[in-house]
């Protein structure tokens, strides 16, 4: 649902030996639209004490985020769906706002929500392993129109009743064990540069479980180095030359420290 029907998510046994035996794999042959126009949790929704980030295909109907000024994609539909990382349904004012922004009546709007502390929440966040690679590529100013296909995988994090711990585990699954393979048009040099810059190890904040990093910044999420939000390992294939480039590595010790 988060991918707008343009991607597939599967759960399968881990590749090789690992303490965490099941991994999510995400594939899309239209990854820019699937990941950035739909799955990316970029729509901030709030009312009084309620706050959540919205993802899902309804975002491309509303086009409220600056990101859409850079995406050559528009959508129209009589129904809309928004996915929230939240433990409760949105209040009526948020429902009304989203319905109006999407151009649908409230009875044609569906919200799907799951708390981060749940298994469903773990699946939703870890399932963004391909999306974070696309978002990082965008932040690096790589031409999005050159990304033609993508595959990514990461371990399913065990849920935890504490929000910060649960959030940390879902992020660590990607930061320390996520692997993304992008297929791109353009020169081999551009593909190599992208592979080298994509991995999370390029971040100044790399090297500790995410929950520790979050606490070190006193819960101020936006003070964390944005380049941390990337897969641990990147593989980029230049489809016009057939060359493949790799960078980064999985860190099982940090993953074990996070997952417990």
Swiss-Prot record:
Originating organism: Methylosinus trichosporium
Swiss-Prot/TrEMBL catalytic activity: 5,10-methenyl-5,6,7,8-tetrahydromethanopterin + H2O = N(5)-formyl-5,6,7,8-tetrahydromethanopterin + H(+)
Family according to the record: Belongs to the MCH family.
Name assigned to this protein: Methenyltetrahydromethanopterin cyclohydrolase
Swiss-Prot/TrEMBL GO biological process terms: formaldehyde catabolic process; one-carbon metabolic process
InterPro entries named among the record's database cross-references: METHMP_CycHdrlase
Gene giving rise to this polypeptide: mch
HAMAP family: McH (MF_00486)
One of the Pfam families matching this protein, by short name: MCH
UniProt-listed Enzyme Commission number(s): 3.5.4.27
Keyword Cytoplasm: yes
Subcellular location: Cytoplasm
One of the record's GO molecular function terms: methenyltetrahydromethanopterin cyclohydrolase activity
UniProt GO cellular component terms: cytoplasm
Domain of life: Bacteria
Record's function text: Catalyzes the hydrolysis of methenyl-H(4)MPT(+) to 5-formyl-H(4)MPT.
Keywords linked to the UniProt accession: Cytoplasm, Hydrolase, One-carbon metabolism
Pathway linked to the protein: One-carbon metabolism; formaldehyde degradation; formate from formaldehyde (H(4)MPT route): step 3/5
